Amino acid sequence: MPGPCNCIETNVCICGTGCSGKCCQCGDACKCASGCGCSGCKVVCRCSGTCACGCDCTGPINCKCESGCSCK
């Protein structure tokens, strides 16, 4: 049985308990709310300081951070 967020096998992205799945995308772009765990996710986007990644962030190459923030 695949993990709850093994997006490649299930095509479903389920975020950790109490975590928002807003803007969550399946496949290689599986993503949960900031600070939430999702086993099987392969996307890493780090924004500067306390800034969060934007909804259309799908990886380091097109990392999108909140307005006025930069991706590092």
Curated annotation (Swiss-Prot):
Homodimer. Coiled coil: none annotated. Induction: By cadmium. Cd(2+) 3 binds at residues 26, 30, 32, 41. InterPro entries: Metalthion_mollusc. GO terms for molecular function: metal ion binding. Cd(2+) 5 binds at residues 47, 51, 53, 57. Cd(2+) 1 binds at residues 15, 19, 32, 36. Belongs to the metallothionein superfamily. Type 2 family. Cd(2+) 6 binds at residues 53, 65, 69, 71. Cd(2+) 4 binds at residues 45, 57, 63, 71. This is Metallothionein 20-III isoform A. It comes from the Eukaryota. Keywords: Cadmium, Metal-binding, Metal-thiolate cluster. The metallothioneins are involved in the cellular sequestration of toxic metal ions. Cd(2+) 2 binds at residues 19, 24, 38, 41. The keyword Metal-binding applies.
